[in-house]
C-alpha cells in the first residue's frame, strides 16, 4: 500500500513538471522574434554588398544621399513671400501696358532657351495693377446711364398705359324704387269655445237590486288579512261609504258597476284594522238600471263572487242566502232583461 502511494506521488510530480515545461515552451514559441534573430537580416546585409561601381544595386536603385541646400538670405526670403494685402488699382497708360506685354514676351522667349546646365533664377513676383476710376468719372457715367434709360422708358410706359387703360364712360345711376308700405291685415283672435264637459249621466231611481253573498264555512270566519289581497287582485277599490267598489276601468276609475260591503252591520270596513278584521261574510250588490251593459256587469260580479269563494274557502249564496245554482242564475238574468225592456 505504501509503495502504491509513493508511485502515485512520483507520477503526479512528473506530470506537473511536464505541464510547466510545455507551458514555458508554448509562451516562448508565441513571442515575436527580434530583428537580430530574424533570418532576413543576413539577406539585407548581403544585398548591401552587391552594388556596382556606380553605387546601383541589381534593381537600379542607388544609395540615399542627403544634400544640404544653400542658405537663403533674408532679402530673397522676403521677395518670395506673397503679398495678399489688397492694393488700390491705378490707371495705367497705353505705354505702360505695352511695356508689360513686351516684358511677358521676353519672359516667354527666355523660357524657350532653358537648359539643365543653367542655374535656377530667382522668382520675381509681379504685382497686378488695375485701373482706378475716380469718383467723379463714375458718378458722371452713372448719371448718363440713368438719363438714357429714363428717356427710353418714359414713352414706352406712357404708350403702355394708353393702350391698356380703357376709357371709362360714366354709368347712369340706377334708380331705386321704394315700394310703398302695404298694410298687413290685422288678424283678430277669435276665442275658441271652451270644451263643454259632458254632464254626468243621471240614473233613475233603482228598480231592482241583484245581491250575492260569500260566506265562510260553518263555524269559521273570513280573515281580513286574506280578504284584502283578494279584493285588490279583482280590481276592487276602497271608496265612498267605506266600502269597496268595482269601476268601469280596471285601474279604479270610471263609473261604479257594483259594490262590496260587510255582511255584518254596520257593513263597513276599516283599512287600518284589516289584519285583525274578521267577518262571517261579504255581500256584493248591483242596482238596476246601472251604468253600461247590465248583462256584462252582472257577469263580472258573478265571476268575482266565485273567485272570492275559492280564495277564502267560502260558499256562494244568492240574495236569500240560499246556495247558488243554475236556476237562480237564470232568474237573475230574467230580472235584468225585464229592466231593459
UniProtKB/Swiss-Prot annotation:
Gene3D superfamilies: ZipA, C-terminal FtsZ-binding domain. It comes from the Bacteria. The chain crosses the membrane at residues 7-27. GO terms for cellular component: cell division site; plasma membrane. The keyword Nuclease does not apply. It holds the Pfam family ZipA_C. GO terms for biological process: division septum assembly; FtsZ-dependent cytokinesis. Residues 192-201 have a biased composition (Pro residues). Residues 90-100 have a biased composition (Polar residues). Residues 28-341 are cytoplasmic. It is a single-pass type I membrane protein. Keywords: Cell cycle, Cell division, Cell inner membrane, Cell membrane, Membrane, Transmembrane, Transmembrane helix. It is found in: Cell inner membrane. InterPro entries: Cell_div_ZipA, ZipA_FtsZ-bd_C, ZipA_FtsZ-bd_C_sf. Residues 1-6 are periplasmic. Residues 35-134, 157-201 are annotated as: Disordered. Its main location: membrane. Residues 175-190 have a biased composition (Low complexity). Belongs to the ZipA family. Interacts with FtsZ via their C-terminal domains. NCBIfam families: septum_zipA. Essential cell division protein that stabilizes the FtsZ protofilaments by cross-linking them and that serves as a cytoplasmic membrane anchor for the Z ring. Also required for the recruitment to the septal ring of downstream cell division proteins. This is Cell division protein ZipA. It comes from Shewanella sediminis (strain HAW-EB3). The lineage of its organism: Bacteria, Pseudomonadati, Pseudomonadota, Gammaproteobacteria, Alteromonadales. The gene is zipA.
Amino acid at each position: 500500500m505504501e509503495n502504491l502511494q509513493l508511485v502515485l506521488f512520483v507520477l503526479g510530480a512528473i506530470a506537473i513538471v511536464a505541464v510547466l515545461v510545455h507551458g514555458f515552451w508554448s509562451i516562448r514559441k508565441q513571442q515575436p522574434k527580434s530583428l537580430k534573430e530574424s533570418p532576413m537580416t543576413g539577406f539585407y546585409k548581403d544585398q548591401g554588398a552587391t552594388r556596382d561601381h556606380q553605387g546601383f544595386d541589381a534593381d537600379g536603385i542607388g544609395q540615399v544621399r542627403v544634400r544640404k541646400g544653400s542658405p537663403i538670405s533674408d532679402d530673397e526670403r522676403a521677395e518670395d513671400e506673397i503679398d495678399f494685402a489688397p492694393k488700390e488699382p491705378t490707371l495705367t497708360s497705353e505705354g505702360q501696358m505695352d511695356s508689360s506685354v513686351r516684358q511677358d514676351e521676353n519672359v516667354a522667349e527666355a523660357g524657350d532657351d532653358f537648359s539643365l546646365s543653367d542655374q535656377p533664377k530667382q522668382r520675381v513676383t509681379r504685382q497686378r495693377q488695375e485701373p482706378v476710376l475716380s469718383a467723379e468719372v463714375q458718378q458722371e457715367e452713372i448719371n448718363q446711364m440713368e438719363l438714357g434709360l429714363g428717356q427710353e422708358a418714359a414713352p414706352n410706359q406712357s404708350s403702355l398705359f394708353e393702350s391698356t387703360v380703357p376709357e371709362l364712360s360714366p354709368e347712369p345711376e340706377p334708380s331705386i324704387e321704394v315700394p310703398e308700405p302695404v298694410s298687413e291685415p290685422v288678424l283678430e283672435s277669435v276665442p275658441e269655445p271652451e270644451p263643454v264637459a259632458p254632464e254626468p249621466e243621471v240614473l233613475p231611481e233603482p228598480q231592482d237590486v241583484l245581491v250575492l253573498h260569500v260566506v265562510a264555512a260553518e263555524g269559521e270566519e273570513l280573515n281580513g288579512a286574506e280578504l284584502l289581497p283578494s279584493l285588490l287582485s279583482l280590481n276592487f277599490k276602497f271608496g265612498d261609504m267605506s266600502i269597496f267598489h268595482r269601476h268601469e276601468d280596471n285601474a279604479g276609475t270610471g263609473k261604479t258597476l257594483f259594490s262590496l260591503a260587510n255582511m255584518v252591520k254596520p257593513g263597513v270596513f276599516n283599512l287600518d284594522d284589516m289584519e285583525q278584521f274578521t267577518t262571517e261574510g261579504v255581500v256584493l250588490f248591483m242596482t238596476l238600471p246601472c251604468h253600461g251593459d247590465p248583462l256584462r256587469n252582472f257577469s263580472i260580479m258573478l265571476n268575482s263572487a266565485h273567485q272570492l269563494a275559492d280564495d277564502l274557502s267560502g260558499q256562494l249564496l244568492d240574495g236569500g242566502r240560499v246556495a247558488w245554482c243554475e236556476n237562480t242564475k237564470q232568474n237573475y238574468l230574467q230580472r235584468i232583461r225585464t229592466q231593459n225592456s
